[in-house]
């Protein structure tokens, strides 16, 4: 029985991510927010809360983007309620997803570990 509940939260997470992605793009245009996209949504088991992770094109404007979404959370939740067939739409909590920044930092560190001359020898040899 618990497995069914888990699958339901996963399905709802996917639907919220898809629908909210379109609403966020409209909010970017209408409210002058930095360009961003919804990268992931985690819904609690009781479906009362949803953590929404967003990636921002300009990392230095991430605080502004998340603050703007938090200000629009009520409006975005109402839009979700109109499109989703749920008795109760989860409360939205927006967070900046820094996984892209961390991945870029790791790539930079790895690139710096191997000098360019050594990399060419490994490829040709």
Swiss-Prot record:
Keywords: Cytoplasm, Ribosome biogenesis. One of its GO terms (biological process) is maturation of SSU-rRNA. One of its GO terms (molecular function) is ribosomal small subunit binding. It holds the Pfam family RBFA. InterPro entries: KH_dom-like_a/b (IPR015946), RbfA (IPR000238), RbfA_dom_sf (IPR023799), Ribosome-bd_factorA_CS (IPR020053). It comes from the Bacteria. It is found in: Cytoplasm. PROSITE patterns: RBFA. GO terms for cellular component: cytosol. One of several proteins that assist in the late maturation steps of the functional core of the 30S ribosomal subunit. Associates with free 30S ribosomal subunits (but not with 30S subunits that are part of 70S ribosomes or polysomes). Required for efficient processing of 16S rRNA. May interact with the 5'-terminal helix region of 16S rRNA. Belongs to the RbfA family. NCBIfam families: rbfA. Monomer. Binds 30S ribosomal subunits, but not 50S ribosomal subunits or 70S ribosomes. This is Ribosome-binding factor A. It comes from Xylella fastidiosa (strain M12).
